[in-house]
């Protein structure tokens, strides 16, 4: 039969690239699970009353090249002015060796959070380096492996200050008046829900205020002033007030470490270390504190431990602080943070080393001195005598200066009364400084760079002598070796080789949606049109961004059944927090601020109760029945008991038990009956898109994990994006922003992230995914995800019982394998199976969530039948090994499972095990071998002997 031109054009070609099983493989799997078609399978599994009658209207699919061309045309509407706005964001020079070998490398960006340390030693080492950079520059004892951005780090610092404060009756948090405005915005938002009063005043007036438990200072101040806070911090410490300092990472290369001045907590943005501005993100925040406060710190902390052979190995330390264990009692709701960006900053420091970083910092400061000297020579007044890279210049004709700047395609900071702000950076050249002279003084200024340079080189007083760093930084060998591109390339490759990412094997983590992050989706994030915009540039310079964001928001509205989408939250946890704040403020607008009870099913993600606590709510747990579904009787009882105090319910759909609950609409109706709102966690949206939607089900608000359902890569633990979709009545209560008016959002609320659109530069990934898939492809992706999960469940059911199923014995897009019966019989645990899977070349499924003693498997739609069968065969082979243990062929204490994973060095070491080398490292015919570099980690040793900075190079060898 002759094909039509439309068929030959094949606009849906990407759908077949994204979805792993081809049509023949899909039919084989459908036959295996006993279904006629994808539609028939979906019809059996998804409750009839929530199935969409018509698909969401998000358009037809486009080819990769057509979508890239369309997005390039949109991006070209952005105007790339030279930015001197500052305020925590500067232009950078990302070394090409890091750009090509990390940011553009799926071996780095497709990995998951390092919960399985044996397959994560490379990025754990890079993160440990990041912590070492933080420790050296801040002068403190303990550092985390990144937070979401500087402003949210400030909010975390405030919360931490209250936790560790000895002034238990104090309830006021002091913020210095020269803190960045976006930071103050986020701090105020967080303080409101915690019931803290925020005081903003000149730092020197802090002692005039009573009942203060914590203080936030900025070094360098938002308008450029360097402060010597040594005496002030000493006085605050004598009064038991916890001191936090927001610090500029590049300035710290030259300035005295705040920790040395007595600060308790120091944080800031690592953006200046090689990460483009990207219209606001993503950027990693660094965070450090005194050792005595380590168990109150937020975020991941990488620690040095030992493996089963006694060798040095790295892991995430002190996880008992975190939301997935402590739930509403956690220090923070932060889970995934900004690992990929932290690793870029880490490797930027490795590549430049201390000498290179000092050269960059000194060059920035020298050019700032030259600019200052020239302006003062011509009669202009600087507001601050002490500065690093930012000048606050008083100008009589401010409008004229700004007009000349615009004509020269330059952005200055314009929100300072009777002055302009100018922040220089590592991209600034002497030619740029001459251009600034012309903008501020006119073309006939007569100034010469070399003459000014001679003057300031011998007589610079812009940094107080007491504020100059007098200690060495980055003395560890890792920062003093890899300075040629060859060495750097090989070092990065050596780290990458240690890890298991999607470029090597499927990562079947339940509730994580480790799907394809297509190359075509990733390409636009490094386009200068997207990468080089300042988040506070004039809106007319960001029309491309505005168009792309508006289009993406419109698609998400149609896919979710909501009325509006807010793009600001820069992680799923932030999305939860923002959604719950919208509910809280909605109730307050109706004079029902007393509604503060949040119902949460026992099966919920740990972030749910942690977020509810952060939003000022009380958590009440709703029971689940023996089938894993929400117990409607208990729900009604808890809702009735809460009565007029019921705020909301947080529910995940499909449930975390891997089934579509038949009564989800009834759950919504019960909560609405008692005046509550329904928060539907978007973690499992990959089983909804095109089939049903939160709004159609009856929910009021959801966050969407763009780093799951909509293809933003996990980056080894970030970046993420968690925009929220809301019904119309909640739209006025989504986050706003104090610096930038968000077009189309009639909101009066404070910000939850530093930038108005969160991590805007990764939004093109989701735009590309939706554009290339179209309505047809998006629905098919959800259906194949469901098919793949059911295929795995059906083939493994006899070996590993599936704990929960819905109608007709089906699961949704993931399934829970019950290991408990085997564990009781043989003592082989879910942990042993997880580690043994490494020997078979796989990352483990999710362990012991939501039920202890289980493995939760989510294959996603991107994995082919070949890969699914490889995983299934590995699991069946492991079951056969367990049977060998059960039969007494191998002893309980010495078998391939309890000794897993096995490493290369064991092949040449003395071998005393009752099984062969081949069984250990090439089980069941494994040919394409992934080699872990460490054996099983000793978690107890790591937490009892906490060490979170770089170890000698010899320890890695």
UniProtKB/Swiss-Prot annotation:
Assigned EC number: 1.4.4.2
Reactions performed catalytically: N(6)-[(R)-lipoyl]-L-lysyl-[glycine-cleavage complex H protein] + glycine + H(+) = N(6)-[(R)-S(8)-aminomethyldihydrolipoyl]-L-lysyl-[glycine-cleavage complex H protein] + CO2
Keyword Flavoprotein: no
GO molecular function terms attached to this record: glycine binding; glycine dehydrogenase (decarboxylating) activity; pyridoxal phosphate binding
Any GO BP: glycine decarboxylation via glycine cleavage system
Gene Ontology cellular component annotations, sorted alphabetically: cytosol; glycine cleavage complex
Cofactor(s) needed: pyridoxal 5'-phosphate
Function: The glycine cleavage system catalyzes the degradation of glycine. The P protein binds the alpha-amino group of glycine through its pyridoxal phosphate cofactor; CO(2) is released and the remaining methylamine moiety is then transferred to the lipoamide cofactor of the H protein.
Subunit structure: The glycine cleavage system is composed of four proteins: P, T, L and H.
Protein name from the UniProt record: Glycine dehydrogenase (decarboxylating)
The species this protein was found in: Shigella boydii serotype 4 (strain Sb227)
Lineage, uppermost ranks: Bacteria, Pseudomonadati, Pseudomonadota, Gammaproteobacteria, Enterobacterales
